[in-house]
Swiss-Prot record:
GO CC terms of this entry: large ribosomal subunit
Matching Pfam families: Ribosomal_L32p
Higher taxonomy: Bacteria, Bacillati, Mycoplasmatota, Mollicutes, Acholeplasmatales
Biological process annotations from GO: translation
Name the record gives this protein: Large ribosomal subunit protein bL32
Gene: rpmF
Domain of life: Bacteria
GO function term, MF aspect, one: structural constituent of ribosome
SUPFAM superfamilies given in the database record: Zn-binding ribosomal proteins
Key words of the record: Ribonucleoprotein, Ribosomal protein
Family classification: Belongs to the bacterial ribosomal protein bL32 family.
InterPro entries given in the database record: Ribosomal_bL32 (IPR002677), Ribosomal_bL32_bact (IPR044957), Ribosomal_zn-bd (IPR011332)
Species, as recorded: Phytoplasma mali (strain AT)
Amino acid sequence: MAVPFRRTSKTVKRKRRTHYKLSAPNLVVCPITKNFTLPHRVTKNSGYYKDKLYLANKKID
């Protein structure tokens, strides 16, 4: 089994870990409900995408 020849220093570890980060999601405002949603997706609340209804909200009485 391979063993590292030298110990990895703190700076080398930290420089490598600077690329391990999350990016913030792009959010757009739904023109119908004014809620934030992901772009190019049907909104969960209204069911609209590009001014067309794709999901009908089912109400249980």
